[in-house]
């Protein structure tokens, strides 16, 4: 679990830094618009929208920009309809990779994703080729110095499936259906959540050497830089050396 937690923290910090340079605002706006179009503009009754708005706020997006994206989604105007799609493949070292996208042009998206895999020693697979290696779950990372016993008690009582503590970081894993119940219970108790999201979590991590890790990181970075890509997941287990170099 520690490997999952550290990688999530690195991705979180990198995302905030990238957002300050304007690299991910387009993706965030796209997710907010689609979430509002699919589930309505009320955050209290639309969990996907609530999570998307939280990500945007964490990335320092202005509330006016968020509200405009919600209005576009609810109104169903401005541009082609976005379609959610997922691509599966293998990266360097046989690492399994899932790529979640939102796009108005499937041909463009699959071409760009395939090019990224090919350029960095991977290959795009067929539907179902690696998705069975992942489970859709909720992940909640608590802010530092939160009371461990209290967090564990509240999380488990609310339906969490696992709670782990390492180096002062508390990570909570939930079934999808219990994710918002657990998150709300923690926040209602006055506990501080650092980050939370629904994720595709690898059932088993695959250890890779540092050379493979460097190639894999280049592939993941290239995928994440594509406008149509929203999330990239892998089952790689990075060494402490690599994790520290990215921290």
UniProtKB/Swiss-Prot annotation:
Localisation per UniProt entry: Cytoplasm
Pfam families xrefs: TACO1_YebC_N (PF20772), Transcrip_reg (PF01709)
Main location class: cytoplasm
One Gene Ontology molecular-function label: DNA binding
Assigned keywords, A-Z: Cytoplasm, DNA-binding, Transcription, Transcription regulation
Cellular component aspect of the GO annotation: cytosol
Coiled coil (UniProt feature): none
Keyword Oxidoreductase: no
Single GO biological process annotation from the record: regulation of DNA-templated transcription
TM region(s), chain numbering: none
Domain of life: Bacteria
Alphabetized HAMAP family for the sequence: Transcrip_reg_TACO1
NCBIfam families cross-referenced by the UniProt entry: PRK00110.1, PRK12378.1, YebC/PmpR family DNA-binding transcriptional regulator
Family stated for the protein in its record: Belongs to the TACO1 family.
Protein name: Probable transcriptional regulatory protein lpg1286
Species of provenance: Legionella pneumophila subsp. pneumophila (strain Philadelphia 1 / ATCC 33152 / DSM 7513)
């Amino acid at each position: 679990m520690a490997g999952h937690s550290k990688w999530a923290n690195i991705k979180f910090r990198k995302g905030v830094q990238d957002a300050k340079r304007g690299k991910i605002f387009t993706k965030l706006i796209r997710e907010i618009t689609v979430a509002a179009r699919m589930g309505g503009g009320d955050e209290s009754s639309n969990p996907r929208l609530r999570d998307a708005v939280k990500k945007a706020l964490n990335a320092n997006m202005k509330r006016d920009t968020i509200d405009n994206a919600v209005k576009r989604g609810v109104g169903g105007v401005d541009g082609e309809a976005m379609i959610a799609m997922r691509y599966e493949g293998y990266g360097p070292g046989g690492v399994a990779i899932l790529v979640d996208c939102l796009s108005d042009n499937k041909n463009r998206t699959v071409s760009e994703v395939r090019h990224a895999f090919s350029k960095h020693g991977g290959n795009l697979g067929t539907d179902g080729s690696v998705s069975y290696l992942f489970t859709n779950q909720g992940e909640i990372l608590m802010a530092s110095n939160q009371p461990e016993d209290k967090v564990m008690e509240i999380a488990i009582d609310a339906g969490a499936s696992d709670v782990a503590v390492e180096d002062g970081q508390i990570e909570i894993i939930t079934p999808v259906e219990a994710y918002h119940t657990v998150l709300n219970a923690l926040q209602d108790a006055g506990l501080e959540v650092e980050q939370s999201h629904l994720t595709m979590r690898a059932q088993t991590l695959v250890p890779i050497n540092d050379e493979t890790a460097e190639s894999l990181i280049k592939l993941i970075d290239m995928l994440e830089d594509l406008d149509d890509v929203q999330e990239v997941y892998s089952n790689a287990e990075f060494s402490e050396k690599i994790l520290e170099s990215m921290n």
